[in-house]
Amino acid sequence: MIIKINNKRNKIAKEIRDIFQASYTIEAEMLKAIDFPPLKRTISQFLNSNSEFYAYYLNQNIAGVIEINNNQDLTHIQSLVVYPRYFRKGIGRKLVQFMLDTYKSRIFTVETGLDNHPAIKLYKSFDFQEQHQWDTNH
């Protein structure tokens, strides 16, 4: 089940941060990133975020979260995270499909690491197309 969650509540903000830490730790290792900004996000930053957060619940527990920034013309996937124990179970795919079905923007965007092959494969399966590559010091 996918539902919108209220990141302005302390308990929810902590749950969001916990899943971000678990998922982005794996991505940082995959990308060989030493300094990885998603891992630096604080509970306070989640509490104060204007993004929209949706959670995929499995057995009454959050298994995945998608963070969306939306305006009329553009919807951006700010983050898509899944607890590592639920990797390769289709949760990320269901969250992306939910976002595409829910938002009626003309343009959908996402950014991911060049070496994050599972994420790239997922986004390409929804016809996302690479537009740019950036070199970072992460």
What is each stretch, according to the model?
Residues 1-18:
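A short beta-loop-alpha structural element at the N-terminal edge
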Residues 21-45:
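Conserved GNAT-fold acetyl-CoA-binding loop/helix
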Residues 44-55, 76:
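A short helix-loop-beta-strand connector motif used in the catalytic cores of GNAT acetyltransferases and
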Residues 55, 61-69, 76-81:
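Conserved beta-strand in the GNAT
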Residues 82, 88-101, 121-125:
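Conserved acetyl-CoA-binding loop-helix of GNAT-fold acetyltransferases
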Residues 92, 96, 115-119, 136-138:
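Short glycine/proline-centered loop/turn elements that form peptide/ligand docking sites
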Residues 96, 102-114:
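Conserved GNAT acetyl-CoA-binding A-motif
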Residues 109-112, 129-138:
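Conserved catalytic-core motifs of GNAT/GCN5-like acyltransferases
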